[in-house]
Amino acid sequence: MTAAADSDHAARGAADGDRQALAGIADRDDRAKIDRPSPAPRSRYRRFVPLATRWTDNDAYGHLNNVVYLSLFDSAVNAELVAAGVLDIEHGEVIGLVVETGCHFFSSLAFPQPLEAGLAVARIGRTSVSYEIGIFAAGAAETAAHGRFVHVYVDRKTRRPVPLPDRLLAFVKALQ
């Protein structure tokens, strides 16, 4: 076999392998569609936070990069905690550390669109809070993306979990 024939044979083999791999992904995608959540309505959330997009939030595809959404979750939750006076990010003895986050995407958003984050609390534990966050185009009826964000509250110095302070507990209960 010539070098050109070897190269052509290898390319066909790689293409066959690619097709098989893609077929496996397609099968997984079909199963995933069954369990895929739908966009959430505004009524699912208890509080709304206005958010600004930045030029650097867009990626090469012309929409907000997926990692930006997790940053928006973090900003929205912490902005509300600070505004409510239940989190002192500079001097408070108790701080929230993110231990889990995730997101489902439904439609594209891009700079310079104004956004809103809808906030709700899904679960309150002894030392943790599970938030649900929806990202909306400003005024939209359904989420463009929604996800979860879990804080474990810890002592600032020791970084050991502590029970939720009373004021924080009252605030997050109002978001359930």
PLM region descriptions:
Residues 53-55, 70, 96-98:
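Residue-level recognition of hydrophobic positions within alpha-helical transmembrane segments
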Residues 50-54, 104, 150:
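Generic structural detector for well-ordered beta-strands
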